[in-house]
């Protein structure tokens, strides 16, 4: 009973053992007559439904707006992406992507179980239609101790626990392939969605000896070496300084001594121990020369980058000066425009004053002409009166003279 349960239990070890026995073991059969030796063509397994291809239209990160089920696959429309509308006989689905994937996984699992049960029924019917006796080879006889080992699976072990034992079946390559297909179908497991990778977090770690800070990715890598005795960690350069010229490592925190230390990464750890020490003050120079040749960017590129950066700084400074000059010119132009407006206002005021003075001058000129005309008239009248007075005076004097004589 325990062997039957182990054979039917879907554990990885049992599946591997079953497949190895099915591939490696060869069963020989003796048909009773030639008529029964003629084989019928083995039934073909039902064709599997080809999975529909899912096409994403637009940005996959955008919300799902519509889903079109077409003969060549399913088109998921995301966001505001444009998609030609399907024909009238096409199905338009508005579904949730996660729920649709879960439903598809359940349908695939149900179809796999149905195929498995159908193949088992077909195998049982074939066994029932052609009852023959099994002839085991000597090394696999039922009475052999090896055949009773828990690693050997008998034909009755392949049946479900509640079914009757099936009759032995005839030998053929088709039967073995059918049995192997049944075992492979039973070994298939539903595909589960893979978990997303853990986010990488940069963490700053301090060395207590040199007080240097290193930035490592948490749970991914480490620049520190750990003692196997005390689990106190130091940076790699401090570890090299401590073990230089020594066969053991002495922790500077708890003074424990150990021969090996550990360096960790995401895959595990590496045991480190001192093999040999060579004192050579020129070795570090040669090492840095190799680094300069192979592990550093080209000096010409760095020089070009520096020159371009300096030129960029000069251009930025020139641009700033040009902007300043433009701003100053704009200020001067605005000031000159204001002065021009003031001068134009003063000119307009002076023009108005000149017009007023011109009018006053014209008025005064007219008055002057009138006064001059009056003066001329008075002068003429005075001259006439003077001549008349002179003539009268002359006449009076003559009369006076005549009167005196």
Curated annotation (Swiss-Prot):
> In which compartments does the protein localize?
Host nucleus
Reaction it catalyzes: S-ubiquitinyl-[E2 ubiquitin-conjugating enzyme]-L-cysteine + [acceptor protein]-L-lysine = [E2 ubiquitin-conjugating enzyme]-L-cysteine + N(6)-ubiquitinyl-[acceptor protein]-L-lysine
Name by which UniProt lists this protein = E3 ubiquitin-protein ligase IE2
User: What EC number(s) is this enzyme filed under?
Assistant: 2.3.2.27
User: What InterPro entries does the annotation carry?
Assistant: Znf_RING, Znf_RING_CS
What high-level taxonomic lineage is stated for the organism?
Viruses, Viruses incertae sedis, Naldaviricetes, Lefavirales, Baculoviridae
GO MF entry, a single one:
DNA binding
State the UniProt keywords alphabetically. Answer: Activator, DNA-binding, Early protein, Host nucleus, Host-virus interaction, Metal-binding, Modulation of host ubiquitin pathway by viral E3 ligase, Modulation of host ubiquitin pathway by virus, Transcription, Transcription regulation, Transferase, Ubl conjugation, Ubl conjugation pathway, Zinc, Zinc-finger
Judging by the UniProt lineage, the source's domain of life is: Viruses
